[in-house]
Regions:
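S-adenosyl-L-methionine
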Residues: 1-46, 54-61
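SAM cofactor-binding core of SAM-dependent methyltransferases
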Residues: 43-105
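A short acidic, Gly/Pro-enriched loop at the edge of an enzyme's catalytic core
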Residues: 105-115
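A short SAM/SAH-binding and catalytic strip from SAM-dependent methyltransferases
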Residues: 113-126
Length: 126
């Protein structure tokens, strides 16, 4: 729970949010992120640099039979975006807090995503 971007409102990432710090060590085997969704058979699309979740919110409405996984490494934006998706009842969307490059390189099974979206990712950590 957090406030900040929400101007005093408590943010709750609920089941939408995934904190990569809670994942098992990457040497314990690869993860298939499709297993995080209710319908694992739907295609998976990944967005890197999800910010406040605007693309995920809009695209999940346009593509209800697609699972979306967004990555954001700025904690405040992650919490705001995941809370926003949760409040809007998006069941086919998850938002991960952490480095997408690290996840895709070390944790994620190969060839699980149909599409990777890169719109406003920040390539330079501050």
């Amino acid at each position: 729970m957090s406030s900040g971007l929400a101007r005093g409102r408590i943010l709750d990432v609920g089941e939408v949010g995934i904190d990569m710090r809670t994942l098992p060590p990457c040497d314990e085997g690869r993860i298939d992120p499709r297993s995080w969704f209710k319908d694992e058979t739907c295609p998976l699309e990944i967005e890197i640099g999800s910010g406040k979740g605007t693309f995920l919110l809009q695209q999940s409405e346009l593509q209800p039979n697609t699972n979306f996984l967004g990555f954001e490494w700025a904690a405040e934006f992650y919490r705001y975006g995941a809370d926003r998706l949760r409040r809007n009842g998006r069941k086919s969307v998850k938002m991960a807090y952490g480095d997408a490059t690290e996840f895709l390189q070390y944790w994620c099974e190969d060839q699980v995503a149909e599409v990777i979206h890169l719109y406003f990712s920040d390539p330079w950590p501050k």
